Amino acid sequence: MASFAQVINPMTGQNTWQERGDDYDYHQEVANAGFGDMLHDWERNQKYDAAIRKTIAGMRQAGKQVHVLDIGTGTGILAMMALRAGADTVTACEAFVPMANCAARILAANDAAHVRLIRKRSTDIVMGVDMPHRANLLVAELLDTELIGEGAIGIYNHAHEELLTDDALCIPARATCYAQVAQSPLASQWNSLKILPDLDGDILLRPPTQLLQCSGEAALHDVQLSQLPPHSFHVLSEPTQIFHFDFQRKQPLELMRENVVRVQLSRPGSVELVFYWWQIELDDAGEQLLSCAPYWAHPELEQLKATCKDKQRPLANIVPWRDHWMQAIYYIPKALHLHDAGEEFWLRCYHDEYSLWFDAHKEQPEKPARRHSCTCDLHMTYTRNRIGQLNQSIRNKRYLAYLEQAVQSKSAHVLVMGDGCLLGLASAALGAASVYCLEPHRFSRRLLESVVKHNQLKNVKFLDSLKQLEPNELDTITHIFAEPYFLNSILPWDNFYFGTLLLQLEQLHQKLPANVEISPCAARIFALPVEFLDLHKIRAPIVSCEGFDLRLFDDMVQRSAEQALSQVEAQPLWEYPCRALAQPQQLLSVDFANFGVEQSNHGSIKLTAEGNCNGIALWVDWQLSPNENPKSIVSSGPLEPVETGQYVKWDMFVRQGVHFINQTTAEKKYLNWSTQFRPLLGELNFNFSLNANREKSE
């Protein structure tokens, strides 16, 4: 039986009712569960298997029976490894019922049906009811990028108290967390608002005092650190061990700790960031190590380089790829400026039950500090990408080149549409006679109001909705400006909401003022067939893993993805290298002066470079003015002209769209595509297929 759910359409801004099957939430959760890329992580799988084999063999040699508990079994892969290695009994628990049901089928298909499967959280297991006796070997994968963010501390503490014997071993046995302090003008753009200069370098807008004094958010910024351009940062110290977790310890793991570490500077600089990762010892002897370090700090880099068969693979991608365990950036609340190599400072490291945070001091701190949080609205309102976008110099210069020309007469009256549009406020600083700023979001508006006050801008009026714009005010408007950026947008073309607002303005006032100038005046969507090095694995079928048949898992995920996932998903492609297999092709062009026009287009792209086309990258180019000057284009795609067969350099402050292709592409040299755009309904649909022949024109 179908039901209806209310969903906001980012392109129209309207809540719409969507018909969904009763099991839609189930399919959505399955499709987004994220088990897939873990099972493509060959290093993780091989080292878990080796540790399980070695540990069980050692317990057998010591004359012990082996009773295994697998917490969070997922597909059952670790439980099957334990059974294959000779465990006497194996109990697996999985609280996510769809996954547990799938695990039961996978266990049966792999002759492992006598694994005891409990459809509960481990913390809900009752000894004597769910398990006949305690286990003496715990195998689990309870970790995330922060190590402890999925509740590992509490789960291990409960397991030792209620489910394990006193001499139980654990796989993994131990974990060590590492921190490396760094300075990066690029990464700092993700955390603070910089001065906005005009094209001559003179100051247009200064950040308010509360922004400069704000400590920011303590939360991690998870990224693929290895993909940071080497020239964009300097590490200021060697990696430092900050926390150690002994998962085999019978005594409870501490829920909160502080560790103040003395760090020596390897070069002068500003301590702005902490690069963070962890390493686990899977077996008790510590022989099976798995490190999440970026390539420059990876303990096995030389060995991995020697064994890598792809000699064209970039150095940053030699280390095993994984998207479930990445690295993280933590931002120091107040940068510490140090001038001499060899100088020492104190790095304060904290963790609670689920998260970490950091601070840095010149002198050893005497009192513990509370976890810091945003007090300026910037960090709590905008994503890291958006904060970086606000600071993006080349991007801002293109908008300012348009705005300086637009308001040069000093009689310009500007209507600004978009969330957190500082560039719109810049038009007031450039001399616009008046600026009307549509800003319906409370925190975003409060932030912009503080910018107006701090910079003493006298000619700015904020609007909660377009209905507040009086007819006489609308009649004076000479320019309508947007970046565009809206908080509800996920995919690049969700920002076509700008066109919806233009239509609303026409409906409210019958027509737009004569000769009003709209910027951006147009937008174009481009597509590029690519070969991802690794990103495609998040949607690629597993088939088999360490000798176990996982096709039932593939089938379940595929069925759910078809019902719950979008054709295109948003990804920050700078973190995921890919090679271009052709030149980009335009799929759709939108004229914002005639936004309501429906369109259907189709075409073909010939793949001219060797490679396996496993994805299509999509982005939007915004045309700020009608002239064809390339500098009037702001792109959310490649930063440099695309070279077929070469890696693409992507914008680092926006997410692009990605359509994944899970089919064999040998002998298929044409990407046939079609688009259907229905702006009044907020619908933009894509269809892609790889074929041996070009699509015939109608």
Swiss-Prot record:
UniProt GO BP: peptidyl-arginine methylation
Name of the gene: Art7
EC number per UniProt: 2.1.1.-
Superkingdom: Eukaryota
Protein name, as recorded: Protein arginine N-methyltransferase 7
Presence of the UniProt keyword Methyltransferase in the record: yes
Pfam families hit by this protein: PrmA, PRMT_C
Function: Essential arginine methyltransferase that can both catalyze the formation of omega-N monomethylarginine (MMA) and symmetrical dimethylarginine (sDMA). Specifically mediates the symmetrical dimethylation of arginine residues in the small nuclear ribonucleoproteins SmD1 and SmD3.
One MF term in the entry's GO annotations: protein-arginine omega-N symmetric methyltransferase activity
